[in-house]
């Protein structure tokens, strides 16, 4: 007599094996407070999309998204510019503490015709989330059939690690590993080291697989604004920009240093006074005067935004010698295409050369000469942006996240800690 349980047992073993083959790892940061931090998502466009359409996918400000990628916002109608498929962007998000771990739940998605949880996770959001994670985040909604217009919460990975990496200011990027990536290539691309990446992600060995999500520390400039300022804690990664004070102020991280430089933004909005009190200095003005005793510097600096007022500080200092001009990251023109010959190269170095600077991470690289304004003039670069992981950030853990796709034969969710496996 045949054992009816044997085929079922073999079936479950096979299903389990297939599921484990599709398992990806991600780093989770435990937390206990209600504080938030700025974080970044590494996102590769799955199709041509307008700037506003990309921003809408993540419910972020389109102008801030452009500046996070050093894209010039002075171009006419830049928010409706069509960005090419395969372009890699850094998406600025707010990282919260939810159910004891760091994640972002501020992104919502309305389903469209032919959507599945798999296509939403793998295609629309580029593997930053799994179908199972979407299902868990929307457990009160019947997802057996996705009706057009169903509103879904999209849980996205993020990390804070106290805004530091090896005791230096840092912002963390959630990066989805591609098939051609190596740890050395990722480390080189984002100006870090394999050892640091391994420590931050609590990896026993620097082994990665496609679909893994790494927390990548980006060196940054931190602010020192008063706690009552709405932009208290602003941190900007090197080579990027940030808008603050209601789009009135544009800040950057000076290349080769940890100094944040702020000046009036290049977009037209109604703003409060940007003049330093009891002076003729405007926000961002710096003067130097060399004398026999040294260099006298006078600076009108940004000090935060509070109650609709732009706070400024006038400071004077004496230094041994006068500093050279600010070395700020070049702004680039809104990209129209992604060079095919660069689309599938391994992660390149972020170090600028005379011809290229990489902004197209997961998909490709784009020429990053200073952007030419619509009138033909060159736009001067006038700004930039932004774990205690000497032995890895305290409390960071690597776990196996959920499989990236469903298996059609049976859907059996087995919760294990913070992860769900689908057989």
UniProtKB/Swiss-Prot annotation:
Phenotype upon loss of function: Impaired sensitivity to peptidoglycans (PGNs) leading to higher susceptibility to infection with virulent Pseudomonas syringae pv. tomato DC3000.
Domain named LysM: residues: 107-154, 173-216
Pfam families per the UniProt record, alphabetical: LysM (PF01476)
Topology of the protein relative to the lipid bilayer: Lipid-anchor; GPI-anchor
Protein's gene: LYM3
Region forming the signal peptide: 1-24
The protein's assembly and partners: Interacts with peptidoglycans.
Source organism of this protein record: Arabidopsis thaliana
GO cellular component, one term: side of membrane
CDD domains from the UniProt entry: LysM (cd00118)
Organism ancestry: Eukaryota, Viridiplantae, Streptophyta, Embryophyta, Tracheophyta
Name of the protein this chain belongs to: LysM domain-containing GPI-anchored protein 3
Glycosylation sites: 162, 238, 285
